[in-house]
Amino acid sequence: MLIIGIAGGTGSGKTTVVRKIIESLPAGEVVLLPQDSYYKDSSHVPVEERQNINFDHPDAFEWSLLSRHVAMLREGKSIEQPTYSYLTCTRQPETIHIAPREVIIIEGILALCDKKLRSMMDLKIFVDADPDERLIRVIQRDVVERGRTAEAVMERYTRILKP
């Protein structure tokens, strides 16, 4: 089994790299664990306050669950991967059944941040891109896929992502 970690800033092209890796391997041999699926549940936080959560900080993730799931897959056990809604900024009750495969890809902005998780990886990739190009990609993605306004994306970029 090969475990690959792919990290990089928001809009850097991580998803494109993941897609190219998956396309280059035989069908059915790869399982993708998006780090976003492991955001801590914030359903207890009032809706208006969820917009103030820094989802690009290591504290936003449930590292212990992600590490446990990777270990289980490595042991040949299936997992129930959490699901996350960008629209409500909460973990959803539904899970996705994931069976072990020959290649596990862990993808996310901070996928290489946690020491325990990083030690499980056989290959670590950091994707970098021009900041202006990243901003354009983030605006395009977040407006279409996540229901945000361009103004909200720009505000988040200047307040959280750029610094």
For every predicted segment, state its role.
Residues 31-34, 40-88, 103:
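Conserved nucleotide-sensing/catalytic segment adjacent to the nucleotide-binding pocket
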Residues 17-18:
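Post-Walker A alpha-helix
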Residues 23-31:
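Post-Walker A helix-loop "phosphate-sensing" segment adjacent to the P-loop in P-loop NTPases
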Residues 92-146:
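ATP-dependent NMP and nucleoside kinases share a basic, alpha-helical "lid"
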Residues 10:
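The conserved Walker
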Residues 144-163:
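Small-molecule kinase domains that catalyze NTP-dependent phosphoryl transfer to phosphate-bearing small molecules
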Residues 14:
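Conserved lysine of the Walker
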